Amino acid sequence: MIIGIGIDIVELERIEQLMMKNEKFIDRILTEEEKRIFFQLSPKRKVEFLAGRFAAKEAYAKAIGTGIGKNVSFHDIQIMNDDNGKPIVVSNGKDCRIHVSISHSRDYAIAQVIIERLS
């Protein structure tokens, strides 16, 4: 049974401007493990990665019904990749399955999250 759906879209240019304007923006959005991956990427790929993670975390927060705010921060949500490269939300929730999709175009990154109750 689906218990939550969230979607978010961001402009790559906006994320790039925020990265250049404020060094702490990266620290605010990414967890330590996500940053390890981020800093190994090319400049273009860094923007796509950060924008995709930003959108996925926003989508997840919408799917759980809170949005990003006082109850859920960007650091409470970690988006990694499985062995096949598929994005996954690292979560302690054992009674639900979380589906994540991230896509990029020339100008945008978009992410959708669906939370499914297993029992």
UniProtKB/Swiss-Prot annotation:
<keyword id="KW-0460">Magnesium</keyword>
<keyword id="KW-0275">Fatty acid biosynthesis</keyword>
<keyword id="KW-0963">Cytoplasm</keyword>
<keyword id="KW-0479">Metal-binding</keyword>
<comment type="function">
    <text>Transfers the 4'-phosphopantetheine moiety from coenzyme A to a Ser of acyl-carrier-protein.</text>
</comment>
<dbReference type="InterPro" id="IPR002582">
    <property type="entry name" value="ACPS"/>
</dbReference>
<dbReference type="Pfam" id="PF01648">
    <property type="entry name" value="ACPS"/>
</dbReference>
<dbReference type="InterPro" id="IPR037143">
    <property type="entry name" value="4-PPantetheinyl_Trfase_dom_sf"/>
</dbReference>
<keyword id="KW-0808">Transferase</keyword>
<dbReference type="GO" id="GO:0006633">
    <property type="term" value="P:fatty acid biosynthetic process"/>
</dbReference>
<dbReference type="GO" id="GO:0019878">
    <property type="term" value="P:lysine biosynthetic process via aminoadipic acid"/>
</dbReference>
<dbReference type="InterPro" id="IPR050559">
    <property type="entry name" value="P-Pant_transferase_sf"/>
</dbReference>
<dbReference type="GO" id="GO:0005829">
    <property type="term" value="C:cytosol"/>
</dbReference>
<feature type="binding site">
    <location>
        <position position="8"/>
    </location>
    <ligand>
        <name>Mg(2+)</name>
    </ligand>
</feature>
<dbReference type="InterPro" id="IPR004568">
    <property type="entry name" value="Ppantetheine-prot_Trfase_dom"/>
</dbReference>
<keyword id="KW-0444">Lipid biosynthesis</keyword>
<keyword id="KW-0276">Fatty acid metabolism</keyword>
<keyword id="KW-0443">Lipid metabolism</keyword>
<dbReference type="GO" id="GO:0008897">
    <property type="term" value="F:holo-[acyl-carrier-protein] synthase activity"/>
</dbReference>
<dbReference type="GO" id="GO:0000287">
    <property type="term" value="F:magnesium ion binding"/>
</dbReference>
<comment type="similarity">
    <text>Belongs to the P-Pant transferase superfamily. AcpS family.</text>
</comment>
<dbReference type="InterPro" id="IPR008278">
    <property type="entry name" value="4-PPantetheinyl_Trfase_dom"/>
</dbReference>
<feature type="binding site">
    <location>
        <position position="58"/>
    </location>
    <ligand>
        <name>Mg(2+)</name>
    </ligand>
</feature>
<protein>
    <recommendedName>
        <fullName>Holo-[acyl-carrier-protein] synthase</fullName>
        <ecNumber>2.7.8.7</ecNumber>
    </recommendedName>
</protein>
